[in-house]
Amino acid sequence: MSYSERIRALREDCDKTQSDIAKLLKVGQRTYCDYELGKTRIPVDSLIVLAKLYNVSMDYICDLTDIKGRFPGK
C-alpha cells in the first residue's frame, strides 16, 4: 500500500472528510485530494501532523510497517 492509500484509509477510519484534513494541514481540499491520489507529494511536516492525529508512526504511513502503533518495535 502506498502512503497516499494509507493516508486515505486512515482518514476514512476516523470518519473525516478531505476538507477536514485539508483545514488541519492548511491546504486546499483539492491539494489534499491530490495527496491521496498520489498526484502531489505530501510535505514531511504534513505527514508528521497526520501521524500525530492518527496516533501512528511515520513508518506506518510510509508503509514500512503494518504495525499501527506510534512506536513499532517498542
Where are these regions (language model features)?
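Short basic helix-loop element that most often maps to the first helix and adjoining turn
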Residues: 5-24, 49
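Conserved hydrophobic/aromatic packing and binding residues within compact polymer-binding modules
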Residues: 7, 21-22, 32-35, 61
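Conserved amphipathic alpha-helical interaction elements at protein-protein interfaces in regulatory
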Residues: 9, 13, 53-56, 67
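DNA major-groove recognition helix of helix-turn-helix/homeodomain DNA-binding modules
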Residues: 26, 45-60
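Recognition helix of helix-turn-helix/homeodomain-like DNA-binding domains
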Residues: 26-41
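Short, charged recognition helix plus adjacent turn
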Residues: 34, 62-74
